[in-house]
Every structure is written in structure tokens, then in C-alpha cells.
Regions:
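A detector of single, family-specific signature residues
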Residues: 1-229
Length: 229
């Protein structure tokens, strides 16, 4: 069993702490509109910056509701400030890390995905072959086999959920985002036409894991005009 380095454990703590604060902010933002709807108050479409002003405007004539909602808004404000601190810390860490900067040369890979991959893999020498990375993190189909039949099922979902989710989000950006055309996107679009978008996203996530590991191992940036793998 691989024992993560202290630096990797610090990076993971930063990622999970940032995610925790972000999730709590989202919980408040998602819960309040539904709660206020019970009083006939409709929040409507509003961005994060104007969210608090909109809520306070709605409850201004409802003193009891305002007294209850006020602490939630104050808690949200504090959470957003602390989330911002961790997010800036993360961006600075990525900016000064040459491995993360190299990983970000790949399509769909931003600071969060790069740092997550760097943290979870920790040491590329752990994997003798780049193709092992996708299987290790649960992005390969399960094989069901008996004496009479052999079929593949859904992905195994073993390994680190944080990395698997990050790769999935990166793959979604590759396939649906407006970014520069590249061989990985072309391959993923072809898979989507044959097998559907959901399977294409998983396939691109798996291939992206292979590409990122190879880039890290070989100290090379993503080659936009060359074959991906």
C-alpha cells in the first residue's frame, strides 16, 4: 500500500478543506430559496454576489423570517471569505508547482484538476504503465465472466473518488467546452457518436488519466497536434 508523502497529505488537506467550505456555501444558497418559497417569497435567478441583497430585500417585511434567515446569511458571508482564502492558497500553490503547471497544458485541466491529480497519484513511478492509472482509480468497466459468457459492466468506481470526479469534470469540459480543438476531443466526439455522451465522458476521463501520467513521467507538455496516446 502506497504511503503518501507529507507534502501530498498537506495538498489533500487543502483540497478537501476548500471543498468542504464550498459545499457549505452551496447548501445555504440551495436551501434558502426553497424555504422562502413557503412564505410566497420567490428569489428568482440571482448570482452569488447579489444573493444576500436579494434575500434581505425579500424578507424586509417579514421580521420573524428575517430574524431566522439573518444568521444563515452571516454564516454564508464568513464561509465565503474563508473559502476565498483557501482558494487563493490553492492557486498560489499550483502557480509555483512545475508539475501542476505542466499538467495544466492538457485540455480540460485547470488548477483544481491538476492539483488533485498531483496529490492522488503522488509518485508516477507507482504505476509501471500509464494505462494502469485509469483502472486504479475506478475508470475501467468491470468484467463479468463465467464458463459460458463474458461481458463488461459499469465502471468499477474503486480508488479515490476525489480524483475520479475531477477527471470526469475535466472530460466534460474537453467534450462540451469551447476550447481549442485537439486529438483527445476528436477521439471523444467519435466515441460519443458511437456509444453516447455518458460513456464518452468516462472514456475521455480514463484516457486523460493516462495522458497526464505519461506527461508527468516523461516531463513533457501536452502535444496538441500529435496523437494523444
Amino acid at each position: 500500500m502506497h504511503v503518501k508523502t507529507p507534502a501530498s497529505q498537506h495538498r489533500r488537506l487543502l483540497l478537501t478543506s476548500r471543498k468542504l467550505l464550498q459545499r457549505k456555501v452551496y447548501d445555504i444558497e440551495n436551501d434558502l430559496p426553497g424555504s422562502l418559497r413557503n412564505f410566497g417569497l420567490k428569489v428568482g435567478v440571482v448570482g452569488a454576489v447579489k444573493f444576500e441583497d436579494r434575500i434581505r430585500e425579500l424578507v424586509a417585511d417579514h421580521p420573524v423570517v428575517a430574524a431566522i434567515v439573518g444568521p444563515l446569511l452571516e454564516a454564508r458571508a464568513v464561509l465565503r471569505i474563508q473559502f476565498g482564502k483557501l482558494h487563493r492558497m490553492l492557486l498560489e500553490l499550483v502557480r509555483t508547482d512545475p508539475i501542476c503547471r505542466r499538467l495544466m497544458s492538457a485540455p480540460g485541466v485547470g488548477p483544481i484538476v491538476a492539483l488533485t491529480f498531483r496529490t492522488c497519484v503522488d509518485n508516477p513511478a507507482r504505476f509501471s504503465r500509464s494505462k494502469c492509472v485509469g483502472a486504479h482509480y475506478g475508470l475501467t468497466p468491470r468484467l463479468y465472466q463465467s464458463s459460458e459468457i463474458a461481458r463488461t459492466g459499469r465502471i468499477s468506481r474503486c480508488g479515490d473518488l476525489m480524483l475520479r470526479s475531477s477527471l470526469y469534470e475535466a472530460a466534460l469540459v474537453v467534450l462540451t467546452g469551447p476550447g481549442r480543438w485537439n486529438s483527445l476531443k476528436a477521439w471523444g466526439i467519435a466515441v460519443a457518436r458511437r456509444r453516447g455522451m455518458q460513456k464518452a465522458i468516462v472514456a475521455v476521463a480514463r484516457k486523460l488519466a493516462i495522458i497526464l501520467h505519461r506527461m508527468w513521467r516523461d516531463n513533457t507538455d501536452f502535444r496538441w497536434t500529435a496523437p494523444s496516446v
